[in-house]
């Protein structure tokens, strides 16, 4: 017998069969190692995004830009921050407790303050530029540089009432739900020619399929008045709830979803919940807004737009505010080169396109409503001719910081001429 046999007796187990506890411990260790190997890089990625921002190349977001809203269909998550990185820009977005981008503005208006509420879509939201570069912030700075006159305001505040993907219906609902609480002295609506008419019409967007709509629409009744269709998005389910929590709280998850899965086409499991407007992609083509021969659906879309703008004006005026309309043009309306890319070498004559047509339509609506109207095409074209461009991003199609600066200056002049604001 080996001399060490008495010192180390054999284990009383069946030969060739490891103990049950040992097997469990082995598997627990293996699972722990796998989880550690998976989680440690994610935790490191989470920490690096929070400390350094978008340090990795590529196009992605480190947070969620929009969440579902029971009244507007969608809006910004409150008290949320994220980075947005694209080929053309990188921006940091911070929302306040009310869901607006930028600093918090108290609801109660301080004495001596003149407030301007700006309603609009992604051009007001302006996620393509930094907070101080947005036209609403530049406008605020321009106005506050001129305070001090006898009997005038001691401060101007421009209140953010914009969100990407909104149409005039959502802007009206925001005015009623939140905007009027700020006691604005003036309400400006920034109307984007490119898609606001289509956003206002369920016929243009979804062929009238109400069951696909998950944002609010106003639709005509037989008597010509408008009926509000409330949003009815599908419930997200368990996986949807988990994903929404991760989108709100994990930079790494947002990076993986927006920067990896989306590119691989593997992020559509929850697409119905994430979709902002509808359960299917809106069908209207933005270029049709330039067509001078209106089909029935476009004629209806313009009529709905006319009625909605009147409702916004009435709501503002009834609560003691003045109201103005600002036309935000497309890149093709400002740049001749961009217009040729849309309409062809003949400028759209053969296709029946006129890039000034939507402007004339909106100007007629403003005249009917007795509403001061500013068309931003002339100042933007003049600035482009003077070499101040680029005013729009080529791919993203929204204003650059230079475009926002031109808009702010033009709106400032408009306010002085119409209401002596800032003079």
Regions from the PLM with identified roles:
Residues 46, 121, 171, 187, ...:
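Generic structural signal for small/hydrophobic residues in well-ordered secondary structure
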Residues 151-180:
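A conserved hydrophobic secondary-structure block that centers on an alpha-helix together
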Residues 372, 393-423:
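Histidine-centered active-site loop/cap adjacent to the catalytic His
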């Amino acid at each position: 017998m080996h001399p060490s046999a008495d010192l180390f007796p054999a284990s009383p187990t069946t030969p060739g069969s490891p103990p049950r506890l040992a097997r469990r411990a082995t598997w627990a260790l293996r699972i722990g190692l796998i989880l550690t190997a998976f989680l440690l890089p994610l935790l490191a990625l989470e920490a690096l995004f929070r400390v350094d921002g978008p340090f990795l190349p590529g196009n992605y977001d480190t947070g969620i830009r929009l969440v579902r809203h029971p009244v507007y269909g969608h809006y910004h998550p409150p008290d949320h921050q994220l980075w947005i990185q694209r080929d053309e820009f990188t921006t940091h977005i911070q929302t306040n407790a009310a869901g607006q981008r930028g600093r918090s503005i108290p609801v109660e208006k301080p004495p001596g303050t003149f407030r301007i509420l700006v309603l609009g879509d992604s051009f007001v939201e302006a996620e393509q530029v930094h907070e101080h570069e947005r036209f609403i912030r530049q406008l605020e700075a321009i106005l506050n540089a001129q305070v001090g006159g006898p009997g005038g305001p001691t401060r101007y505040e421009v209140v953010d009432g914009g969100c990407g993907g909104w149409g005039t219906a959502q802007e009206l609902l925001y005015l009623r739900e939140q905007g009027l609480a700020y006691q604005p002295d003036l309400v400006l609506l920034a109307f984007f020619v490119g898609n606001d008419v289509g956003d206002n019409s369920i016929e243009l967007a979804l062929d009238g399929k109400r069951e696909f709509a998950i944002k609010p629409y106003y639709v005509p009744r037989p008597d010509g008045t408008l009926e509000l269709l409330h949003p009815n998005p599908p419930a997200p389910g368990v996986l949807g709830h988990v994903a929404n929590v991760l989108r709100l709280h994990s930079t790494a998850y947002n990076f993986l979803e927006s920067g990896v899965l989306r590119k691989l086409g593997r992020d559509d499991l929850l697409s119905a919940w994430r979709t902002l407007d509808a359960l299917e992609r809106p069908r209207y083509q933005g270029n049709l807004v330039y067509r001078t021969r209106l089909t029935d659906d476009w004629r209806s879309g313009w009529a709905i737009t006319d009625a909605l703008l009147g409702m916004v004006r009435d709501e503002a005026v009834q609560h003691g505010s003045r109201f103005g309309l600002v036309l935000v043009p497309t890149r093709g309306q400002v740049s001749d080169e961009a217009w040729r890319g849309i309409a062809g070498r003949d400028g759209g004559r053969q296709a029946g396109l006129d890039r000034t047509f939507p402007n004339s339509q909106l100007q007629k609506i403003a005249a009917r409503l007795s509403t001061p109207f500013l068309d931003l095409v002339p100042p933007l074209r003049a600035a482009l001719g003077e070499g101040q461009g680029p005013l729009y991003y080529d791919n993203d199609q929204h204003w650059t910081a230079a475009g926002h600066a031109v808009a702010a200056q033009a709106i400032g002049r408009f306010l002085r001429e119409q209401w002596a604001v800032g003079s």
